[in-house]
């Protein structure tokens, strides 16, 4: 809510409840066929980015999460197994890794799983069972907790595991901000900084070369 207030107070107009049908050279067309003209467009639609920008190598990577009932003090800080990075960087096989985060409510958020090539958002019972068995291996007492909800989501993944931040290869008026996988919110401020620096032709304190979309085209043709 505070972010929304800040955006509006700085002169932006928010259009909510509308879907972008297409990105064109000088703007976007939304689902009521209204055309919104713009000097540049930022495609920051996560794993759905390829639907609006053809040719970018971003794939959906499905994940499961589970949240428990309230157990204040059960875990006081996030715990992650060392193999989490290996799971996160796997590019082919389904994988699970132990990750638990206590919430302010006293609930425990438990993950994680990763699956490529899955379009359905339905709960995958076998992969969920693997994920929870992994968690209980690390913390046996988790088996005594009650869960209240399980859900899935899709991460936006790139071949080299780095996000695409910068101008599209085929449209200089289009900028991409996608492919962050599970770190989109965590790295959002840095992503915004890199984008703004490129748009206003300002030297960035953050190296931009590793994130330029052009590098993925180079990888695919290497």
Report each predicted region and the residues it spans:
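Helix-loop-beta segment of a Rossmann-like dinucleotide-binding subdomain
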Residues: 1-10, 113-116, 172, 178-180
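Helical element adjacent to the flavin cofactor pocket in flavoenzyme catalytic cores
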Residues: 1-25
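Short beta-strand to alpha-helix junction loop
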Residues: 1-6, 122-127, 186
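Active-site-proximal alpha-helical segments within enzyme catalytic domains
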Residues: 5-6, 40, 44-45, 190-198
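Core beta-strand elements of the Rossmann-like FAD/NAD(P) dinucleotide-binding domain
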Residues: 31-40
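Active-site substrate-recognition segment that forms the wall
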Residues: 40, 47-150, 154-169
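Glycine-rich, N-terminal phosphate-binding loop of Rossmann-like dinucleotide-binding domains
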Residues: 45-46, 178
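C-terminal catalytic lobe of FAD-dependent flavoproteins
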Residues: 126-130, 136-222
């Amino acid at each position: 809510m505070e972010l929304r207030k800040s955006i509006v107070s700085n002169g932006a107009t928010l259009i909510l409840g509308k879907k972008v049908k297409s990105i064109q050279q000088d703007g976007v067309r939304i689902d009521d066929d209204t055309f919104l003209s713009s000097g540049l467009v930022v495609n920051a639609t996560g794993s759905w980015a390829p639907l609006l920008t053809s040719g970018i190598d971003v794939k959906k990577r499905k994940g499961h999460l589970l949240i428990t009932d309230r157990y204040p003090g059960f875990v006081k800080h996030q715990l992650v197994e060392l193999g989490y990075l290996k799971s996160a960087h796997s590019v082919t096989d389904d994988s699970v890794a132990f990750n638990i985060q206590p919430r302010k409510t006293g609930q425990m958020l438990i993950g994680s799983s990763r699956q490529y090539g899955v379009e359905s958002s339905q709960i995958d019972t076998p992969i969920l069972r693997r994920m929870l068995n992994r968690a209980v291996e690390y913390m046996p007492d988790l088996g005594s907790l009650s869960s209240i909800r399980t859900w899935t989501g899709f991460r936006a993944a790139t071949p080299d595991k780095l996000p695409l931040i910068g101008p599209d290869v085929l449209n200089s008026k289009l900028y991409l901000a996608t492919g962050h996988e599970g770190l989109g919110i965590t790295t959002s401020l840095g992503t915004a900084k890199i984008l703004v620096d490129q748009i206003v032709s300002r030297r960035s304190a953050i190296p931009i070369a590793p994130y330029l979309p052009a590098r993925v085209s180079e990888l695919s043709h290497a």
